[in-house]
Amino acid sequence: MTQSLADMRREYTRDGLSEANAPSDPFSLFRQWFDDAVKTERLPVEPNAMTLATVDADGYPHCRILLLKGLDERGFTFFTNYESAKGRQLAANPRAAMTFFWPALERQVRIEGSVEKVTPEESDAYYQVRPLGSRLGAWASPQSRVIADRAELERLLAETERRFADQPPSCPEHWGGYRLLPQRIEFWQGRPSRLHDRLDYRRQDGGWSRERLAP
């Protein structure tokens, strides 16, 4: 390393997050922040990139970067192979956490809740708008399984291309969406001297409570 990790730091200088300007519904605030990120973050950064954390049957946590592909009043939707490691973990423990980080805005959002599969119709609707290569890849890749080498993956793809040479690929039964149903959403805004703003929303009596947390 060319620089000590202890010396790596930056000061946060953007506007704060106050209760007076924060809506009572966290979905409204998330949409506002997400729209800001889309306008502010520059490619190749993907504003819908998030860290998804799951826990396996033995209690070990796992995390990886995914892309958010849907948002409505029910929750946050992403898609994957149901037979992948994350799919098996969610089958054993259908709870997860998401983290979005938008460094240009000095903002972070943490989301926690239970997870459910979306309907086959929802999965198919998204699958059909994916690029052809991605649709074929959903069939070809035995996600999270050990393979011999890159050549094996390319062979599987070639077999899949031949299989669907005369017809468009349909959505595989082993592939589809999950929806995280949030119970807690925390908004973090970087502030000077590490005295950050944190607003914590929690499901309560059919609505949402909101509290400020110390940084």
UniProtKB/Swiss-Prot annotation:
Cofactor: FMN
Record flagged with keyword Flavoprotein: yes
Reactions this protein catalyses: pyridoxamine 5'-phosphate + O2 + H2O = pyridoxal 5'-phosphate + H2O2 + NH4(+); pyridoxine 5'-phosphate + O2 = pyridoxal 5'-phosphate + H2O2
Enzymatic class: oxidoreductase
Keywords: Flavoprotein, FMN, Oxidoreductase, Pyridoxine biosynthesis
Residue numbers binding FMN: 64-69, 79-80, 86, 108, 143-144, 188, 198
GO biological process: pyridoxine biosynthetic process
Family annotation (InterPro entries): Pyridox_Oxase (IPR000659), Pyridox_Oxase_CS (IPR019740), Pyridox_Oxase_N (IPR011576), Pyridoxamine_oxidase_dimer_C (IPR019576), Split_barrel_FMN-bd (IPR012349)
Listed EC numbers: 1.4.3.5
Source organism phylogeny: Bacteria, Pseudomonadati, Pseudomonadota, Gammaproteobacteria, Pseudomonadales
Gene giving rise to this polypeptide: pdxH
Pathway(s): Cofactor metabolism; pyridoxal 5'-phosphate salvage; pyridoxal 5'-phosphate from pyridoxamine 5'-phosphate: step 1/1; Cofactor metabolism; pyridoxal 5'-phosphate salvage; pyridoxal 5'-phosphate from pyridoxine 5'-phosphate: step 1/1
Binding site for substrate: 9-12, 69, 126, 130, 134, 194-196
Cofactor comment: Binds 1 FMN per subunit.
Keyword Flavoprotein: yes
The family this protein is said to belong to: Belongs to the pyridoxamine 5'-phosphate oxidase family.
Annotated function: Catalyzes the oxidation of either pyridoxine 5'-phosphate (PNP) or pyridoxamine 5'-phosphate (PMP) into pyridoxal 5'-phosphate (PLP).
Protein's name in the database: Pyridoxine/pyridoxamine 5'-phosphate oxidase
Subunit field text: Homodimer.
GO MF annotation list: FMN binding; pyridoxamine phosphate oxidase activity
